[in-house]
Amino acid sequence: MGIGLIILYLLIGLLAYDFTKKNKKISKNDPKQPLAIPVLGHLHLFGSQPHRSLTELAKKFGGIFTLWMGDERSMVITDPNILRELYVKNHLNFYNRASSESIRIYSGNLVDISFSVGESWKNRRRYVSAALTKTKVLNVITLIEEQANFLINSMQYYAKSGEPFFPHKYYNKYTMNIVMSIGFSKTISENESVEEGPISQLIIPFYNILENLGSGNLGDYVWYTQPFFYFKNKKLEQDTKKVYTFLEEIYNEHIKNLDESNPRDLMDQLIISTGGKEKDMVIHVSTDFLLAGSDTNASTLEWFCIFLANNPEIQKKAYEELISVVGKDCKAVTTKYRDDCPYLVGAIKETLRMRTPAPLSLIRVSEEDFMTSGGIFIPKGTQIVPNLYGIGQNFVDDPSSYKPERWVEYYKNKTPTREMEATTETKSNITTEILPNDLDKVVLPFSIGPRNCPGNIISEINLFLACSNILLNFEFSNGGKKIDETEVFGITIHPKDFSIQLKKRE
């Protein structure tokens, strides 16, 4: 028998073994799963928009189903009750993140807050929560209001000239400045571009990291393909090093000028709380803060403008509500008006539902074998993929329609009595005990449980001040041609490049 034939038989045997392993039930309580193929498992089903593909699969296979991501057994959660059971009631078994070669490179071998595990994560979360709490809220609001004013000023030119306004770089600068101001007292000046000047040493490699992590890496899921991704990982390593070096200089400045009685920003707070002994952690947490706080909010602002430009009647209604609250002579909207603008707030929340910034969040791992209250068995080591986008789609009426009024009606009708009620409904083959259209429980842009987004309050202020002041100052339109609402998948989902026409409000 020739060596070639032996290799062929071995290959066929390995493929047969892999096929059997990935399709064999390990208990009678296994969730459903589609047929897996050797090597890839179910990766071929993800397509270019995995969040949409998984949402459709949930309608067929249920609110929890198994998928093999290459070598990794995974379970996709598209049921708010199951997600709450795992992430809230049993969070100690599900708070660790999944790791991979790409993640280890980005996180400095898991020393950040996004991907650290076990006691390390608990310590980092405690430091960050304390630092955010001690960062004075009024100071934060003042910083955001200032940046919102800079944003409006930068948009005025396009309203006067009639030139198309491409919002991407302006919204990114707005959100990046907020994060850098709060994080380490740095900003991009009003006349400086994101891609130019000293700050570009941070921004350009930072965006490269986002693109690298968002594009996926087969080597993270099929171990023997890792050599083919050597150069991609090397590029990620180089960009991560550039970001680290830039932030290290800022860290050293903070150490040199530290006044423990008067901390200036989040980095000062972290240095004080760690006694200046956790340099790597502080720098990598700062990188996380940039990632979570800038890109997600910038993309949400873009989607907000797209939906209101494509739905001028909704824009008109939101503007009329805003003017009725702040008055026509108002120069700048502040946070004090937020509670009096339910329709505008509903438009922002509906944007987060329709285009959840991180639709599949970050993958976690089951620390031990676990049986859900519904009798589904989750083996130790299983990856948990929370389909936040799918939950916000499959548990509301008319999910593909942009309806801010659903939020207005929801909060108007929400009472403590209704909050305590529980019904069981089967919708799209997904069983839920949560009330139909219980929006606060099925729209989860910041995730849930102890490992949710620690900066969600800052994010909400950020979005309200930007959206309200843009609406106050400009009527924006799609120029008579509907803007493409198809998203581009990544760590955060973005719209395709687009422009809007701005008209100064009278």
From Swiss-Prot:
Record-stated family: Belongs to the cytochrome P450 family.
Cellular component per GO, a single term: membrane
Regions crossing the membrane: 1-21
GO molecular function: heme binding; iron ion binding; monooxygenase activity; oxidoreductase activity, acting on paired donors, with incorporation or reduction of molecular oxygen
BP terms from Gene Ontology: response to imidacloprid
Organism in which the protein naturally occurs: Dictyostelium discoideum (Social amoeba)
UniProt entry keywords in alphabetical sequence: Heme, Iron, Membrane, Metal-binding, Monooxygenase, Oxidoreductase, Transmembrane, Transmembrane helix
Main location: membrane
CDD domains: CYP1_2-like
Descriptive protein name: Probable cytochrome P450 519E1
Name of the coding gene: cyp519E1
InterPro entries membership: Cyt_P450, Cyt_P450_CS, Cyt_P450_E_grp-I, Cyt_P450_sf
Names of the cofactor(s): heme
